[in-house]
Amino acid sequence: YTLLSIPADGAQFLVVPEGAAVPTDVPDGVTVLRQPLQNLYLVSTSVMDLFLALDALDCIALSGTRAEGWYLDEARQAMLDGRIAYAGKYSAPDYEQILAANCGLAIENTMIYHTPEVKEQLERFGIPVLVERSSYESGPLARMEWIKFYGILLGKEELAQQVFDRQAERIAPLLDQQSTGKSCAFFSISANNLANVRKGGDYVARMIEMAGADYVFADLTDSGNSLSTMNLPLEDFYAGARDADFLIYNSTIEGVVSTTDELVAKCSLLADFKAVQNGHVWCVAQSFFQQSMEL
């Protein structure tokens, strides 16, 4: 038996081994999860990479993302092959399909809190709901460490530890890397002309620091909510990032930009930026957010 807790929202889960009896004294508010966990409804896309690393794709029967929304080849192929079915997005799940699949657990992200009635309805149907928060971690290694959480759920603790240890070993040389003195901005431009940037405590900001650069918006704080990003007026973004040595465009929000000219066409102010003039502009692939186990 293992009791798992997600402190941010007070959720607790009692993992009961296969064949074991459920204790009679389980406190109210503790969700019982009986192993083996099967026929999962996976809504949180950042979790899929962890399941792939644990060789647990076959535990997932339902997806909250259509095949074309997956940038992980194995996940997309599983949907195209019919091994995983689309069961509706977080705000509009197909309850009938989920019940028919004998779903053992719904793994959501915090978007579900925008439609709490959906979470309540799933639970009324007897489907436990886990709201994962790996994307709120302040560093990439902490985000990867959630693999231990899922290793416990799936009865693959030893494998999860091995996978995590390998990743930690890969990252170790970066932790002692000296600063290059260079600065970097990570952003996207929204349709309503705002710059979406990561807050200073976000894992992406930490990745930039690990690579030896200074994140130009490191001083942006929580601002009263738990979101890892915030929108800035273009003039504020201009003031903070114009002199950055490198720009990294986040394609996972507004789509891929293939050339610097395309980027400047989205936001003409960028033509004045040092990184644009020096040819130091990059764009992350749309798979970036889903590749939780990569660095």
State each model region's role:
Residues 40, 46-49, 66-69, 93, ...:
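Solvent-exposed loop/turn segments at secondary-structure junctions
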Residues 137-162, 243-295:
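Structured C-terminal subdomain patch of bacterial secreted/periplasmic proteins
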Residues 41-45, 49-52, 159-212:
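Basic- and aromatic-lined ligand-binding clefts that recognize polyanionic substrates
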Residues 38, 57-59, 102-104, 125-130, ...:
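Loop/turn elements at helix/coil->beta-strand transitions in domains of secreted/extracellular proteins
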